Structure formats: structure tokens, C-alpha cells
Amino acid sequence: MDHGELFFHFELQNYEIRFKISKFVIVISKPIPMAKKYRFNEDWASVFVGLIIVVAIIVATIIPDIPKILPKFGPKEGWTGWTVLSTEVFTSGNSVRVLMTFLYFFFFAIVGSWLMGRKGKELLPAFPIVFILSMISQFIASAGLMKDLGLETVLFSLVIGLFVSNVIGTPKWLKEGIQSEFYIKIGLVMLGATILFSEIMKAGLFGVLQAVIIVLSVWYFAFWIAKKLKVDSELAAMLASAVSICGVSAAIATAGAIKGDSKKLSYVISLVLIVAIPMMIVMPLLSRWMGLTPEVTGAWIGGTIDTTGAVVAGGTIAGDIALKFSTIIKFSQNVLLGIAAFIISIYWTYRKSDNDPAEKPSLKLIWQRFPKFVLGFIATSIIFSFFINPETAVAAGKTIKSYQSLWFNLAFVCIGLETRFKDLVTLDRGRPAYAFLIAQAFNIILTLIVAYVLFGILWE
């Protein structure tokens, strides 16, 4: 084998995949259709693909000679002008990275399609278009202004998909290649790499205590108020998780756990990202006006604002100490994501059984309905928390987060392509939006009280 060459070979009966990277060249052998008895459902296929990608990234982290393929979109603070674009983004080397990234993701999308018993040819015209749209959304989100506003790429992915769907129209051949739920589940399996036990230790007793109190209290209140406003249970669960846990990721994980409607998911995420913008600006100003300590300010911001980018932006405005505490509290809530997804999955299985008395909630039924990608999420988290060198875990985790984000971007482009904007605006006559805003107001007040008691009175 040549130096710097990667070669992957998977074999099952009547099925073969060959994958080779050498000098930026990928070769995929022609597949033989998988025998029916070897087909996976979407959950297991996402676990398989997600874990293979995670293992590949760990290997690439340990072996430095393996080339990095993800494209660059400017410095961490975002691109601000043509000078940065011409020297860091619009370069021949970056063009090769974009091509390599496309081939890498296309390969795994096809692998997933084959594992589920499909031919994979439906992806050939559709996936390149979806990928290009996701790259455009990534480029826009990487602008300095968008970074300052804390706007995440998934918002632009959704908006671009909605634009194509509602202005141009999504052709049938493109719809046939849309796999939004599969891409989301792959991303969720990989998300486990960023949920580490060590983060709980960093937060300490008070950080974990605040996270548990807020998540439990706000989730219950948000679900209750949504039901009072006659929002359906599926949408209410997504709203409650988004408000109480960690915004976008929590909404996505909950949608996967309850097999929720992707249109409702996109609605919730739009609310989360839009509401986070004024909060990250107003909350630091309110903290100064009320004379809160930096510790209380950080705990309040981290426990209330629903997106990590907006938390960092709000914490930065409030000062270095507030930024540190807001980040720690946010990580504490993020850690609870896997536990929450597991509990919601079990609850939803029993709830379905209650609606259908003929089906008793046996262990077999629970297993059949349980979203298997949650197991992949938990497995990845355990591997990175306990079985990998901490330095390797941190380095690989950063790369995995970038790959996971791109899977989410692809998913939300797909969701936008199959959604009519009118359906989002008129969803339940605005009742979910009212429920979200009321729940967020409750979250702001309760978190302020808890943060003040823990970090203003008890904290030394």
C-alpha cells in the first residue's frame, strides 16, 4: 500500500463495497444489490454509517499523514471581505477539498441507501444538488456578520431549501433523492462524540444541579402550556425539548426519538434561532442593569439561550467570567441530551401503547419502536468519554462536530426542499409560537432565580 493511501473493503453475502483514497482519488466498485435478509432499517443503517465515520476520523486523528478534506470558509470569526475570500476560501486547494468532501459524503449516502435495500441510483442526480445548496448555506453562515449574530448554518440550509421549493419548485427527480431523516440520524450518532462525561465534572455540583432543575421544570411546563394551547403532542415534545435542553440539537434528537414530522421540526428550529438573536443582546444588558455578578450572569445566559453560538455571543458581551460560566452551564445541559432522548423514546413507546389498548407495552414492542440511533449516540459518547485518550478525543471530537454539522445541513436543505412555506407560517394558527414564547419567558424567570440562588448566594 502506498504511503498516505486509505483502502476500505466491506463484504456481505451478495454485497461488496470498495472504497479507496489515494492522492485525492476515490474509487467505488460497482455494487451487487444486497440480499433481502441483510437489509437494515433506517435506524440501524444510520448507526452503522455514523460509527464507521467516527472510527475513520479517530484513525485520521491518530495518523497525521492522512489528508484533511473538509473545506475552509474563512477564519473562526468569519470572513469579512474579498481579501479573506481570495486567500482562504476561493482557492484551488479549497476547491479540491470541496470535491473530496462531496465524494466522501456521497459515498456514505450511497452506502446507507444500499444497506436499506435501495439501489442508490436515486441519489445520483439529487445528492449533488443538495450538497451544493448546503455548501452555499455554509458559506453564508461563515460571514462575519452572521457569526456575530449567532446564526447557525442549519437556518440558512432550511431557508435555501424553502426558497427552491416555494419559488422555483422541487422537481420529482430531486424529491426521490431526499433522505432528510437518515442524514439527521447519522448526525445524531456522531453528536455523541461531543457529549463527554468530563464536561459534567467541569460543571461541578452547582452546574449539574442547575441543569437538572431547569431541564425537568421547563420541559414539563413547556409541554403543559403547549397542550393547553391545543398544540399536538408531537410538536409539543419538540418545543419542550428545544426550550429546556439545548435548542436545535435537542429538537432534532426528540424528533428522531418520536419519529416526528420534519416540517414541525423545521418550524421549531426556526423559532429557536430567531428568538435567540434578541436574547443574546438583551440579556447581558439586563444583567448589568440588575447588577448581577458575572457568575450569575453567565449561568443565566447559559441556562436560557437555546443555541451554543448565541450563548457564546451573549457571554462574550457580558465579559470573560460570564462567558466561562455560560459555556459550562450550556455544556451541562447538552450532556443531558442523550438521557433525555432515551427517556422520551421510552415514554413515547408507552404513550403509543396507551392509545392502542390492543398493543401491550411489552419489552419486545418497546425494542421494536425504540429509535436505534439513540444507541449509536450513547455508544459514541461512552467511547469518547472512557476509551479514548483525552487529547485524541478532543481533537477527533472537533473534526466529528464539523462532519456532524454538515450532515445536519444536508438534512435541512432536504427538509426545505419538501416543505411549503405556507405550511410553516400557518401551522396551527400560530399557537406553537405562542407556546414557545410563553415557555421561554418561564425559562428566563426560573433560570434567573435558580442561577441567583446557586451562583449568587451559595457559590464561593
Where do the PLM segments sit?
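Alpha-helical membrane segments and immediately flanking helix-loop junctions
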Residues: 43, 231-279, 295-319, 403, ...
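Oxyanion-binding "anion nests"
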Residues: 319-356
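Entry/N-cap segments of selected transmembrane alpha helices
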Residues: 94-98, 126-131, 135, 182-223, ...
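Structural signature of hydrophobic alpha-helical transmembrane segments
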Residues: 91-104, 147-160, 203-216, 241, ...
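Glycine- and small hydrophobic-enriched segments that form the cores of compact globular domains
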Residues: 140-142, 146-252, 256-266, 280
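Small-residue-rich segments of transmembrane alpha-helices in multi-pass membrane proteins
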Residues: 51-54, 127-139, 159, 182-195, ...
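Helix-coil boundary and interhelical linker segments in multi-pass alpha-helical membrane proteins
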Residues: 197-206, 287-295, 316-328, 452-460
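Structural signature of multi-pass alpha-helical membrane transport proteins
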Residues: 35-39, 44-90, 105-118, 123-178, ...
